C-alpha cells in the first residue's frame, strides 16, 4: 500500500502528474517547532523524517512525507498563524531572494530514504497595496512563507532557480527517484 503522509492537496496533485495515486492519505501529527538554533535545511529534513516515522503503517507499506520551508538567511518562515503574520512575511520577502527547501522522506518498515531540494526565489518589491491584495485573497493560508507560487503570488515572483515543483511542495524528479529506490513500482 502507498500512503501519502500529507494533508496537502498540492502534494496529491503533484503525485498524480507522475502517475502516483495514494492508496491512503494519513497526515501525521507532529510538533513542528524548530529546535533552538536549528538552521532551515536541517530543520526541514528533520520534519520530513519525523513525519514519515510518525505515520502508522504496516511493514511493507510505502510512506511518503515531505516538508517545505521558506528560509530568509538563517530564519525559518513557516506557515503564518494569521493575516498579520502573513503580511509581515511578505514584507520581509519583498524585493529579496530567499530559499525554498523541500525535504522528502520515504519509509518502508524501519528504513527511510531522504532527499532535500533547495530552490532560490526572488520576490519583486511589493507595495503595501499589493501585500494587502494578496492577503485579502486568502491564498497565503497553510503555505510556508505565507505564499503559494502556483496561485496569485505567481505575479509577485519574476525569477526562480531550482525546482518549480519543489517550491510548490514536492520535487517530482527527486520524489520519483526515492520511490524507485524504496521499491515502489507504481499504482497496482
Curated annotation (Swiss-Prot):
What's the cofactor? a divalent metal cation
Q: Superkingdom of this entry's organism?
A: Bacteria
The alphabetized UniProt keywords are: Cytoplasm, Hydrolase, Nucleotide metabolism
Q: What is its EC number?
A: 3.6.1.9
User: Can you supply one Gene Ontology CC term for this chain's record?
Assistant: cytoplasm
Where in the cell is the protein located? Cytoplasm
Q: Name the GO terms of the biological process aspect.
A: nucleotide metabolic process
Q: Which residues bear the site annotation Important for substrate specificity?
A: 10, 68, 150
Q: Which reaction does it catalyse?
A: dTTP + H2O = dTMP + diphosphate + H(+); UTP + H2O = UMP + diphosphate + H(+)
Give the protein family: Belongs to the Maf family. YhdE subfamily.
Name of the protein: dTTP/UTP pyrophosphatase
Whose protein is this, by species? Roseobacter denitrificans (strain ATCC 33942 / OCh 114)
